[in-house]
Design a protein with these regions (language model features):
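Conserved catalytic core of the tyrosine transesterase superfamily
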Residues: 1-307
Length: 307
C-alpha cells in the first residue's frame, strides 16, 4: 500500500504533467530525483522531510562516484546535484499549495555552479560541417537538411525530432512547441528550405515524422521509423568527422553557433532569447561572453588606427 507521501508524489507528477504542461521526460526526471531522496532518507510522511534530512542527502549526492570505475574519483557535478534539489523544491511548493504541512521550499538553497563553458566550433569548421553531406541521395539530403535546419533555427534536438512532414516550410518560418510547452516562431534559411524540399520529394513512405531512419529500412517499407535524439546526435557526429573537425560536435553545439552567429552580427539579446526559447534572459547572456571577446578584437584592430 502506498504511503501518504508516495500518493502525494503521484498526484504532484500528474499535476505538473497536466496542469503545468511539463514534458514527459521532465516528469520522469522529477519522479527519479524525488524517489531517490525518499529511498535514501526513508521518509514516509510530509512532516518527515526536514532540513537535516535534505542536508544529509545532499552530502551523500556530493560524494557519489560516477561510472563503473570508482578509482577515478569523479563525483556528481553540482549542476546535477541541483537538479535533485530543484525537483524537491517544486514538490514542496506543491505541498504548500495543497496546505500539507512540510518543510518550506525556500529552505533549500542551490549550490553555486562554475560559470558555464560554451562548446563552439570556428566559422570555418561550421562551414565545412554544413557541406559534409554533399550527395543527392535521400540519406545525404536528410543529413544535410538536419544540419541546415539546426543551424538556421537553433532548434533543440528534441524539438527537431518532434517535427512532422506537414510543417509548412514555404513561408520560411514555423511554430515549434519547446520546453514547458511554450510555443515560439523559428525561421529557416533558403539553404535549409531547398534541401528539405529535395529530401521530401524522395520520401515515398507513410511516416508522419519529418526525419526518418533510412539505412536499415527495406525499399518497400512504407512505415519508416522516426529518428531518435541519439540517431540525430550520431548523424551530427559522423558529419563532423567527415568534415575533419577534431572537437566533439553535437546538435547543441550547432545551437550555440546559431546564437553566437546572431549576436556577433548585431542581433539584440532579447530577440535571440525569443528565438532560442529561453524563459530567462540570464540563460541567453552566457553567449555575450563569446561575442564580447569578438568585439574586443574588433576594437583592438580598428580603434584609433590613424594615430
Amino acid at each position: 500500500m502506498a504511503t501518504q507521501l508516495e500518493q502525494l508524489k503521484k498526484e504532484f507528477l500528474e499535476y505538473i504533467e497536466i496542469e503545468k504542461g511539463r514534458a514527459l521526460k521532465t516528469v520522469e526526471n522529477y519522479d527519479r530525483y524525488i524517489s531517490r531522496y525518499f529511498e535514501f532518507s526513508k521518509v514516509k510522511n510530509p512532516s518527515d522531510i526536514t532540513a537535516e534530512s535534505v542536508r544529509t542527502f545532499r552530502l551523500w549526492l556530493n560524494r557519489q562516484s560516477l561510472g563503473n570505475n570508482k578509482a577515478t574519483g569523479k563525483t556528481m557535478s553540482r549542476k546535477t546535484q541541483n537538479y535533485y534539489m530543484i525537483a524537491l523544491r517544486v514538490f514542496l511548493k506543491y505541498l504548500t499549495r495543497r496546505k500539507v504541512t512540510s518543510m518550506a521550499a525556500d529552505e533549500i538553497d542551490l549550490a553555486k555552479v562554475p560559470e558555464r563553458h560554451l562548446d563552439l566550433i570556428s566559422p570555418s569548421d561550421l562551414a565545412r560541417l554544413l557541406k559534409a553531406s554533399p550527395g543527392d541521395d535521400i540519406k545525404s539530403l536528410r543529413d544535410r537538411a538536419i544540419l541546415e535546419l539546426l543551424f538556421s533555427t537553433g532548434l533543440r534536438v528534441s524539438e527537431l525530432c518532434s517535427l512532422t512532414k506537414d510543417v509548412d516550410f514555404t513561408s520560411g518560418e514555423f511554430s515549434i512547441r519547446g520546453k514547458g510547452g511554450k510555443i515560439r516562431v523559428v525561421f529557416i534559411s533558403e539553404e535549409a528550405r531547398d534541401t528539405l524540399k529535395k529530401y521530401l520529394k524522395l520520401r515515398k513512405d507513410m511516416s508522419e515524422a519529418l526525419f526518418v531512419q533510412i539505412g536499415s529500412q527495406k525499399k518497400n517499407d512504407m512505415d519508416m521509423k522516426p529518428l531518435t535524439r541519439r540517431s540525430v546526435e550520431r548523424i551530427v557526429k559522423q558529419c563532423a568527422i567527415k568534415a575533419g573537425i577534431s572537437k566533439k560536435v553535437t546538435p547543441h553545439v550547432i545551437r550555440h553557433c546559431f546564437a553566437t552567429d546572431l549576436l556577433s552580427n548585431g542581433a539584440d539579446i532579447r530577440s535571440v532569447q525569443m528565438m532560442l526559447g529561453h524563459a530567462n534572459i540570464a540563460t541567453t547572456q552566457i553567449y555575450t561572453h563569446v561575442t564580447d571577446a569578438h568585439l574586443r578584437e574588433v576594437h583592438k584592430k580598428f580603434h584609433r588606427k590613424k594615430e
